[in-house]
């Protein structure tokens, strides 16, 4: 089941839709954002991307819509393949879809006992269980520290390393039992969310794909085109903000001879747009 899209009106309005323009929905999912964009198109075209094959079931029967079952990091190649050199607007709603979280067998949530899979693209090989059972102590430390921002990372990794010498860690219930001694009692859900986030990001190469997508979007958009990105955690947010403000991922502001900041994007909204109280309650 796919839930109501986040910031639906704000994000689609942010694209400043030209009824005859070319638009990209890089995270099609349940198709909520795409359906709203299609309502505002006349003779334009919308290309929807989603690497998750489950999204195929939601593709609208609309001649103006083209579905691409691949990662959004290759957006320019597919834009050209569809017959277009430039796009008028690009929308990306990052992170995991509600469907992926709620499907127990996908392994994205610690609410269910399931195989630790966590692949957004079911055709890819690397699973979370591969990471837990084959990664070195150094690499496990890196992903939980950098992608999960876990405080007691050494204790966490030590528990995993010890457990896997006796038995492979393959399911959520097993994993939760292994790491239980280092989970803070008062912050259990937050801690587990950070741990699962770290594994998911590594499995799917999310941050690398995000950087590739932003560079591709910069080159694919026509002058005056719009890019709308919805982020959910500080790692995504930092990458997007740095790139849009400075033109690079380090956030280093470079200026030309006249003192003008060298970047290709002009910020339309200076302040962050957040969901309304009504939307949060839904």
Predicted regions and their residues:
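S-adenosyl-L-methionine-dependent methyltransferase catalytic core, i.e., the SAM/SAH-binding region
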Residues: 1-282
């Amino acid at each position: 089941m796919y839930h109501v899209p986040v910031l639906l009106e704000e994000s689609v309005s942010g694209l400043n839709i030209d009824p005859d323009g070319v638009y990209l929905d890089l995270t099609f999912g349940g198709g909520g954002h795409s359906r709203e964009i299609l309502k505002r198109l006349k003779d334009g075209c919308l290309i929807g991307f989603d690497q998750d094959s489950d999204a195929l079931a939601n593709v609208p029967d609309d001649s103006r819509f083209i579905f691409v079952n691949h990662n959004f990091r290759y957006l320019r190649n597919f834009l050209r393949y569809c017959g277009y050199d430039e796009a008028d607007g690009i929308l990306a709603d990052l992170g995991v879809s509600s469907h992926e979280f709620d499907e127990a067998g996908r392994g994205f949530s610690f609410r269910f006992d399931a195989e630790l899979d966590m692949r957004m693209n079911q055709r890819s090989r690397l699973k979370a269980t591969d990471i837990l059972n084959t990664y070195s102590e150094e690499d496990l430390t890196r992903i939980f520290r950098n992608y999960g921002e876990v405080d007691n990372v050494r204790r966490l990794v030590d528990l995993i390393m010890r457990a896997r010498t006796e038995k492979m860690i393959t399911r959520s219930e097993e994993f939760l039992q292994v790491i239980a001694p280092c989970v803070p009692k008062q912050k259990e859900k937050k801690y587990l969310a950070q741990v699962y986030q770290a594994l998911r990001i590594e499995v799917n190469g999310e941050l690398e794909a995000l950087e590739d997508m932003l560079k591709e979007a910069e080159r694919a958009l026509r002058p005056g085109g719009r890019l709308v990105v919805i982020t959910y955690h500080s790692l995504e947010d930092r990458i997007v903000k740095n790139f849009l403000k400075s033109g690079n991922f380090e956030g280093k502001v470079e200026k030309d001879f006249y003192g003008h900041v060298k970047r290709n994007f002009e910020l339309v909204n200076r302040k962050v747009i957040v969901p309304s109280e009504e939307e949060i309650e839904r």
